[in-house]
């Protein structure tokens, strides 16, 4: 199965009639393994900040999480495992695996819980597969 299939069929799939607005799977170094066509163009330092927050939980809390120039307020996650951010009616969930970052971005009417479910479920699966 190609990495694109994971984005198309597992991240951007329909959940209770809703979809993520965009999603990606990146390496810890910021390399793009696959992404949805409308995933924001990000800067390397934005990914570096995200990775640092996984290594040092709370690093992004004072400044916020930036991705593609968009600032998200960091909200409760799982230190070292999941980062969650909120912006207006939408937000972002990022799950860290041994080799990858799974990112899902949503907006209403999708709920934060639906985004968390989709992103974290795929992340757990990839961890089980050795990624």
Swiss-Prot record:
One of its GO terms (cellular component) is cell cortex. GO terms for molecular function: actin monomer binding. The keyword Endoplasmic reticulum does not apply. It is found in: Cytoplasm, Cytoskeleton. Keywords: Actin-binding, Cytoplasm, Cytoskeleton. Transmembrane segments: none annotated. Disulfide bonds: none annotated. PROSITE patterns: PROFILIN. Occurs in many kinds of cells as a complex with monomeric actin in a 1:1 ratio. Binds to actin and affects the structure of the cytoskeleton. At high concentrations, profilin prevents the polymerization of actin, whereas it enhances it at low concentrations. By binding to PIP2, it inhibits the formation of IP3 and DG. Belongs to the profilin family. This is Profilin-1. It comes from Triticum aestivum. The gene is PRO1.
């Amino acid at each position: 199965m190609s990495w694109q299939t994971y984005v198309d069929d597992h991240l951007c799939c329909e959940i209770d009639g809703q979809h993520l607005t965009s999603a990606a799977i990146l390496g810890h170094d910021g390399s793009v393994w696959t992404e949805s066509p409308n995933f924001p163009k990000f800067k390397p330092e934005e990914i570096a900040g995200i990775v640092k927050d996984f290594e040092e939980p709370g690093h992004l809390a004072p400044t916020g999480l930036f991705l593609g120039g968009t600032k998200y307020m960091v909200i409760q996650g799982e230190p070292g495992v999941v980062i969650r951010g909120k912006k207006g009616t939408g937000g972002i969930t990022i799950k860290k695996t041994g080799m990858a970052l799974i990112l899902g971005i949503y907006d209403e009417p999708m709920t934060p819980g639906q985004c968390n479910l989709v992103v974290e479920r795929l992340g757990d699966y990839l961890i089980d597969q050795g990624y």
